[in-house]
Design a protein with these regions (language model features):
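Generic N-terminal amphipathic, Lys/Arg-enriched alpha-helix
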Residues: 1-2
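Conserved small/polar residues in nucleotide/adenosyl-binding loops
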Residues: 118-120
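A short alpha->loop->secondary-structure connector
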Residues: 109-115
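Short active-site loop/helix that positions an aromatic residue
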Residues: 99-109
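An anion-binding catalytic pocket shared by soluble metabolic enzymes
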Residues: 6-93, 111
Length: 120
């Protein structure tokens, strides 16, 4: 691994820990992928973010072959297809915020409140 790859792997872990700290994720749910070389780096399946090391992040190459000591996230295909289809994206973040999940279970709409969503 190059220094740059190690740096990106560590940034993925930092982002996962931040998601958890901010309540956007709990336990082993959710995942992050980053475009890397001809494929992507992605969080492993079933591993908690606490104690995760750079070597635990999985590389999935352009032929969808995983490289690493763990299996890639169970949602790796969805990450892979997004990064393949949308060249302007360099990362995919998938999380399970408690309130969003609760609203979904209750079948409640979540209203969008952001200036970019206001139609003039």
């Amino acid at each position: 691994m190059t220094k740059n790859e190690i740096k990106i792997r560590k940034q993925i872990i930092e982002a996962c820990l931040l998601m958890e700290k901010k309540g956007l994720n709990q336990g082993k749910a959710g995942n992050i992928s980053v475009r890397w070389k001809d494929g992507m780096l992605i969080t492993p399946s079933g591993i908690s973010y606490e104690g995760m090391k750079a070597k635990d992040i999985v590389f999935v190459d352009s032929k969808t072959k995983p490289h690493g000591i763990w299996k890639p996230s169970s949602e790796w295909r969805f990450h892979f297809d997004i990064l393949k289809a949308r060249k302007e994206f360099d990362a995919v973040v998938h999380n399970h915020p408690a309130y969003g999940t609760g609203m979904s279970i209750l079948r409640k709409d979540i209203k969008a409140y952001h200036l970019s969503l206001i139609h003039i």
